[in-house]
Amino acid sequence: MIIYRDLISHDELFSDIYKIREIADGLCLEVEGKMVSRTEGAIDDSLIGGNASAEGPEGEGTESTVVTGVDIVMNHHLQETSFTKEAYKKYIKDYMKSLKGKLEEQKPERVKPFMTGAAEQIKHILANFNNYQFFIGENMNPDGMVALLDYREDGVTPFMIFFKDGLEMEKC
């Protein structure tokens, strides 16, 4: 299994269990997820090691809730954040500067293609700004990558977009 982490914050963003494809001439990865519902807080009687009490109401003290969301977000504990268009422009400018610095250290051959392609991709993001939900890693590092969540034309299938050069891969 491959875990994809944020190059700057080192937060886990997604893994290779999802359908992943390159978009924007290899600049970004599009990761397709699905909507899931999970029950949280339920306690299985078989784990208690005894019989359920004959007295008192059934299930007393065990509250369970059903949580529905996108599997990528839930599995990797991504945190939703919000931006105005102006705030996102400021964030993405700072993020590109940080990422450019990291690329100059680690992959200097990627700096020029990344900076050229990123400008086009950012224009596309800003043109479709209202379609996106924004997510950051579990540690909520404001300098890390902000992943974009959108839905296919069917309105049901979620997908997330990540800058490929902002990711590091870890084999498990």
UniProtKB/Swiss-Prot annotation:
Designated name of the protein: Translationally-controlled tumor protein
Organism phylogeny: Eukaryota, Metazoa, Chordata, Craniata, Vertebrata
Main location, first listed in the record: cytoplasm
Taxonomy, superkingdom: Eukaryota
Role played: Involved in calcium binding and microtubule stabilization. Acts as a negative regulator of TSC22D1-mediated apoptosis, via interaction with and destabilization of TSC22D1 protein.
GO molecular function per UniProt: calcium ion binding; DNA-binding transcription factor binding
Pfam families, per database record: TCTP
Family of this protein: Belongs to the TCTP family.
